[in-house]
């Protein structure tokens, strides 16, 4: 197939998806339609778009995403976001000698910025520096996944075929006996439904950010969970906690001043206090993992010694 022909196919496919969206009301009732689709609606992006609009995501924003060549469907986002609980992440590398040295260097280099954030939000520089290391190695690893595509893909998590494949994956990962497949499938179905609703909320948040014009959400790159920037905020976290650290009127989480102030603001809003219990609870709110909390707290302590 020539390059011209390939582009023609892509353009025609996108047009068909948008045309199928045009027939949808802005906020139609979602119901629970998991039946196989045909025609234009058989395209995964078309199904994802319809599911998003039916859950209240702005139709014009979805159409804008579909017209962008970066937007795509990828089953790996359905798989990873629904089944990630089956494998336990290892955070131990986050307090090795390289990590400690890097955080100490960061604390020295950005002392004034960190203390400014601390003076407003009461979050120690060592905690901010440690958290940013655990999240993105101080901006070295922010993720290459197209954020809108992550959430569009997750919108299809509760389709039967994906529930079945994810059920088998979880059973294998956790060595679950085949006799328990029905209970695992039921659990995965409920989890998939929650993930679909979660993805819709994140798409709504992306639209709100786009309206604010503080970041261009169409080109956002981040993690497999759609978290982005040095802080690895979800779009909803951006709306609630992102802060302008340099007074330029924008909030760019790939910019260090904004990232530092946003982490401090997030933890402050999450109840950061003087007791270890309050501090651990605030970090746990940032990432719902005891091992994550331990990694941040341990790295902060080791870097300050």
Label the model's feature ranges.
Residues 1-226, 236-305:
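Cell-wall glycan-active module
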């Amino acid at each position: 197939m020539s390059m011209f022909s390939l582009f023609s196919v892509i353009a025609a496919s996108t047009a068909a998806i948008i045309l199928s969206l045009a027939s949808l009301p802005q906020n139609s009732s979602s119901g629970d339609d998991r039946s196989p689709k045909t025609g234009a609606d058989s395209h995964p992006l078309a199904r994802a778009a319809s599911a998003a609009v039916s859950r209240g995501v702005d139709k014009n924003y979805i159409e804008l995403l579909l017209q962008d060549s970066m937007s795509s469907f990828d089953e790996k986002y359905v798989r990873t976001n629904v089944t990630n609980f089956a494998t336990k992440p290892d955070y131990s590398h986050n307090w090795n000698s390289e990590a400690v040295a890097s955080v100490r260097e960061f604390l020295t280099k950005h002392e004034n910025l960190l203390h400014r954030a601390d003076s407003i939000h009461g979050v120690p520089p060592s905690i901010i520096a440690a958290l940013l290391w655990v999240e993105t190695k101080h901006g070295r690893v922010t993720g290459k996944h197209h954020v809108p595509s992550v959430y569009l893909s997750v919108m299809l998590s509760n389709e039967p075929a994906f529930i079945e494949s994810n059920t088998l994956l979880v059973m294998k990962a956790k060595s679950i006996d085949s006799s328990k497949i029905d209970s695992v499938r039921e659990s995965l179905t409920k989890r998939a439904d929650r993930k679909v609703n979660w993805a819709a909320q994140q798409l709504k948040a992306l639209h709100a950010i786009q309206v604010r014009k503080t970041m261009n959400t169409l080109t956002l790159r981040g993690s497999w969970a759609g978290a982005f920037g040095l802080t690895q905020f979800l779009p909803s976290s951006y709306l609630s906690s992102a802060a302008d650290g340099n007074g330029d009127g924008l909030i760019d989480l790939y910019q260090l001043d904004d990232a530092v102030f946003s982490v401090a603001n997030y933890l402050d809003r999450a109840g950061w206090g003087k007791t270890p219990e309050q501090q651990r609870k605030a970090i746990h709110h940032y990432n719902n993992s005891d091992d994550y909390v331990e990694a941040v707290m341990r790295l902060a302590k080791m870097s300050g010694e």
